[in-house]
């Protein structure tokens, strides 16, 4: 037994112990993917091994399994008080797990979209399954054409790669075929009632006259459907006209749309409604599990009628609670309106909650991925805030961000009485990573200070000199750090007069801080994240002429 087989064997024994001696291959794979992150890249290799080893373990008696657990030091750890968090095990079969992320192309993705994308991707990774990206673009009014390219880019930033990609606008002929099949089964009918009449009948649990049309009559109307005007007719799926929820009673599957579609032009006029196209595609694409918000509970029930009419197996529907976004602007329509009016500079304006905006600020993709994974999939509502995001992101930035000086609204000062001549002051790029080396800050009695730091009293220019500030007069006091401490001197940053660069920092409220940074910043590349001491983390966004433009992340 090689090392990989031994790991699989231990997980199989543990799973068997939890399930009366019977291990499940999918659950074993899921356990490995969850607890052995280094092996996730070998999921396809692990699958066949797990199947073989689980079969071996299941042939053992429970006593034999216990003996093997003792031999391999496998223990069942019980912790009933453990708080439920993270992604719990998927219900149902874990064989051939197929899941999907299915956004509307109304704009780029924001944190709310990650709520759906991340769990689907993570579950597929855990169980060695397949992830489908399906662009649900069957409502021309909700299509923002650039989103066709923006959505895959955002998923790539999150580290999510779909195994297959589909566009619902490419699948109209498929929807037409299944609509006709429903009519032929007597499970759908063409309804020519006006909306108000149908609503009154539906609200009173009464069928409309069209419900009793013959199959032949419905097919005749179906064949003429694309010649009708919007609102003249719809195709309805038969459900229960007495259902307690009026929205589920004979819901609309197809309607006329007269708007021009960005991808289709005016090729089609008969458009599927979401519940119809989604159910057809989920069946044809082999979805094993469907994750959706609890606001889709009624839609899941609607779609089950279609599954029943067609004799299809129903996937595992899993619903999760709302994700409340405290102080995070997420509305795509409001963002687009703000961009059009000039309120926002674009989809990556730092005030927005789009993935592009937070990436521009130096928020790491793993921060968002881990945050959503930690929230998990549960019916109770959850809340996130910038404070929570910043706390997680700080863990990623602390070890990678080198430290630099920046002074806002710089004031050049001369230290009277300084006689030590020119010196090069060395400060580490990162105190915890000496291997990265030092920055050199030349000092010869002159420096730039932030205007807010030029205040009367004793101050220490960090690692340089102690000075006495009295109005416009700045006098040398000493060099000793111990003396600065005894004098309770204020420690302030400074930037060399001899070696500096113009810096602007776009803040999270879109305001801009301008000033000077030390010369070592010139070695940075766009995309690098730094920590400006006493200011916070920031990502280099642009290098232009003699100016570096950063976007502020957080403290």
Swiss-Prot record:
It comes from the Archaea. Pfam families: tRNA-synt_1c, tRNA-synt_1c_C, tRNA-synt_1c_C2. It is found in: Cytoplasm. Its EC number is 6.1.1.17. GO terms for molecular function: ATP binding; glutamate-tRNA ligase activity. Gene3D superfamilies: 2.40.240.100, HUPs, Ribosomal Protein L25, Chain P. One of its GO terms (biological process) is amide biosynthetic process. It catalyses: tRNA(Glu) + L-glutamate + ATP = L-glutamyl-tRNA(Glu) + AMP + diphosphate. One of its GO terms (cellular component) is protein-containing complex. Coiled coil: none annotated. InterPro entries: aa-tRNA-synth_I_CS, Gln/Glu-tRNA_Ligase, Glu-tRNA-synth_arc/euk, Glu/Gln-tRNA-synth, Glu/Gln-tRNA-synth_Ib_cat-dom, Glu/Gln-tRNA-synth_Ib_codon-bd, Rbsml_bL25/Gln-tRNA_synth_N, Ribosomal_bL25/Gln-tRNA_synth. The keyword Ribosomal protein does not apply. A motif ('HIGH' region) lies at residues 103-113. Keywords: Aminoacyl-tRNA synthetase, ATP-binding, Cytoplasm, Ligase, Nucleotide-binding, Protein biosynthesis. The keyword Transcription regulation does not apply. Its main location: cytoplasm. Catalyzes the attachment of glutamate to tRNA(Glu) in a two-step reaction: glutamate is first activated by ATP to form Glu-AMP and then transferred to the acceptor end of tRNA(Glu). PANTHER family: GLUTAMATE--TRNA LIGASE, GLUTAMINE-TRNA LIGASE. Belongs to the class-I aminoacyl-tRNA synthetase family. Glutamate--tRNA ligase type 2 subfamily. This is Glutamate--tRNA ligase. It comes from Methanobrevibacter smithii (strain ATCC 35061 / DSM 861 / OCM 144 / PS).
């Amino acid at each position: 037994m090689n090392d990989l087989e031994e790991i699989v064997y231990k997980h199989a024994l543990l799973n068997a112990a939890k399930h009366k001696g019977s291990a499940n291959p999918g659950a074993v794979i899921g356990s490995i993917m969850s607890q052995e992150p280094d092996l996730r890249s070998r999921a396809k290799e692990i699958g066949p091994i797990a199947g073989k080893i689980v079969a071996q373990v299941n042939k053992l008696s429970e006593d034999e399994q216990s003996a093997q657990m003792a031999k391999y030091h496998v223990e069942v750890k019980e912790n009933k008080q453990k708080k439920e968090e993270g992604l719990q095990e998927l219900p149902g079969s874990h064989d051939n797990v197929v899941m999907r992320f299915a956004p509307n192309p109304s704009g780029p993705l924001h944190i709310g979209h990650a709520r759906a994308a991340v769990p689907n991707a993570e579950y597929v990774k855990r169980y060695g399954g397949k992830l489908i990206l399906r662009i649900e673009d069957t409502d021309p009014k909700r299509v923002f054409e650039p989103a066709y390219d923006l959505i895959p880019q955002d998923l790539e930033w999150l580290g999510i790669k779909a195994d297959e990609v589909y566009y619902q606008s490419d699948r109209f002929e498929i929807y037409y075929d299944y609509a006709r099949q429903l009519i032929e089964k007597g499970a759908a009918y063409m309804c020519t009632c006006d909306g108000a009449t149908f609503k009154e009948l539906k609200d009173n649990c009464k069928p409309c006259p069209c419900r009793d049309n013959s199959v032949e009559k419905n097919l005749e109307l179906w064949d003429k459907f694309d010649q009708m005007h919007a609102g003249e007719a719809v195709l309805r799926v038969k459900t229960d006209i007495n259902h307690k929820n009026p929205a589920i009673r004979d819901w609309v599957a197809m309607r006329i749309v007269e708007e021009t579609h960005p991808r289709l032009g005016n090729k089609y006029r008969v458009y599927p409604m979401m519940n119809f196209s989604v159910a057809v595609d989920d069946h044809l694409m082999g979805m094993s599990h469907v994750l959706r918000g609890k606001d889709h509970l009624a839609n899941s029930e609607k779609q089950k009628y279609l599954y029943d009419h067609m004799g299809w197996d129903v996937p595992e529907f899993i619903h999760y609670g709302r994700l409340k976004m405290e102080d995070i602007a997420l509305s795509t329509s409001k963002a687009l309106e703000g961009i059009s009016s000039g309120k926002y500079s674009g989809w990556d304006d730092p005030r927005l909650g789009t993935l592009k905006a937070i990436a521009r600020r130096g928020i790491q993709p793993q921060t968002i991925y881990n945050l959503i994974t930690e929230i998990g999939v549960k019916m109770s509502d959850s809340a996130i805030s910038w404070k929570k995001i910043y706390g997680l992101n700080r863990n990623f930035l602390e070890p990678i961000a080198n430290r630099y000086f920046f002074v806002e609204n710089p004031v050049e000062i001369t230290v009277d009485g300084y006689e030590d001549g020119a010196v090069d002051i060395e400060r580490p790029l990162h105190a915890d990573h000496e291997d990265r080396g030092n920055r050199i800050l030349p000092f010869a009695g002159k420096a730039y200070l932030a205007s807010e730091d030029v205040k009367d009293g004793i101050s220490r220019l960090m690692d340089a000199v102690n000075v006495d500030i009295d109005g416009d007069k700045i006098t040398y006091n000493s060099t000793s750090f111990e003396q600065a401490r005894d004098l309770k001197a204020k420690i302030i940053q400074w930037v060399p007069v001899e070696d500096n660069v113009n810096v602007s920092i776009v803040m999270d409220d879109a305001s801009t801080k301008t000033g000077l940074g030390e010369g070592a910043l010139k070695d940075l590349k766009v995309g690098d994240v730094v920590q400006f001491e006493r200011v916070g983390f920031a990502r280099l966004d642009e290098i232009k002429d003699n100016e570096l433009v950063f976007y502020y992340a957080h403290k």
